[in-house]
Amino acid sequence: MRFAPALTVDKPGCRPYPRPRIMKFCNQCGAPVRLRVPEGDTLPRYVCEACGTIHYQNPRVVVGCVPEHEGRILLCRRAIEPRRGYWTVPAGFLENGETLQQAAARESLEEALAEVAVGSLLSVVHVLHAEQVHVFFRASLPAARYGAGAESLEVALVEPAQIPWADIAFPSTDFTLRRYLEDRAAGREQHHFTTIDRRLRRTPQG
């Protein structure tokens, strides 16, 4: 396992997404909620003023993979915000009732019309400012069959030298692709971990 230093977000227009979650009403009884620290807790939570329900908000999980076919990597150019027009790997939010690997395969089919075989864990990226955890797997694309799904402008199999680094949508994708290529060149499969926080002002080395 390899742990990298925390990264800053330096891609123009790359804002936290989704927006911070703000609650006004209880989803159990419809009464107003108030942000406060409940008794016995240490963090502020939205608490219903009527029924007393405490609404816990936890990080969302984004799952993706790096599909490879005969040495080339499958990339998608986003058709939706955030970062419309920029390139990424197939990825999206984990749904209830599915595993991480199932989510990675589903996103590949939805965004790239590609049926992939999901392999080993590649990276885990804590995106603190967006309240998200991004998980990426290695994957193989058995046949060069793919296309642009509803959320993609175009999809392409590219050689490593053709990756449009300046137009990669998200820092987590950039980190993951670079670690993937490093591992491939070294003939290894490692797990990589890092933290991204746009609130940090320093740019770490390494």
Region spans (language model):
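Conserved hydrophobic/aromatic beta-strand scaffold that supports enzyme active sites
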Residues: 25, 45, 66, 75, ...
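Unchanged
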Residues: 94-179, 183-184, 188-190, 200-206
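Short, positively charged and aromatic/hydrophobic N-terminal segments
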Residues: 10-11, 17-19
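Acidic, metal-coordinating catalytic segment for phosphate/diphosphate chemistry
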Residues: 23-64
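Conserved Nudix-box catalytic region and its N-terminal flanking loop in Nudix hydrolases
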Residues: 68-110
